[in-house]
Amino acid sequence: YGATILADYTAPSDGSTQAYVTYIQNFSTSYPEMNGLLMSSASGGGGETVLNTLKSLVDPGTIKICSFDTFEGMQEGFNDGWLSCLAGGIEIQALFDFVMLYNAVDGHPLADGYTVLYQNFIFITSAEDCENYSKYISNPEYMIYDADTIQSMTVRYNPDCTLKTLTDIMDAYTLESVVATATE
């Protein structure tokens, strides 16, 4: 993609966000040409800390953040030009893991042996995406899948259910599909 890695850091695992402040201050001083940050995780206060640190060091949009995970203030971050992309939405993975377990315990395993399920990320690239993400995906009051869809993933309620039934539902999971279903 034409990116040049100028430096890297290890995200703190102790819950402290001060290390983020130090890293970002050092990077912006050592690499004034730096125009982006790729964060492998913005959870645990990392996203908020990096964004606030950048705000104190450079003009909006000078250094853009692209990250896995979502965080408080992301909508404002897009509006103000600090963010270019966030990847999230994997909270739903637990449903598919549970469905695999449920079918197996119910005597109808969907696969022989160990199976890897790949969950789509939801890519957020604008403030509007943030609004929809917050309203429909990270909102515990909203059900992404209704009872009929969940039952369709089980052999007990859908004798034609297969692993492909489940993976087709997983593959169709996008921000656009969730919003379309919600607004029908």
State each model region's role:
Residues Y1-E184:
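A residue-level marker of the well-folded mature domains of exported/periplasmic proteins
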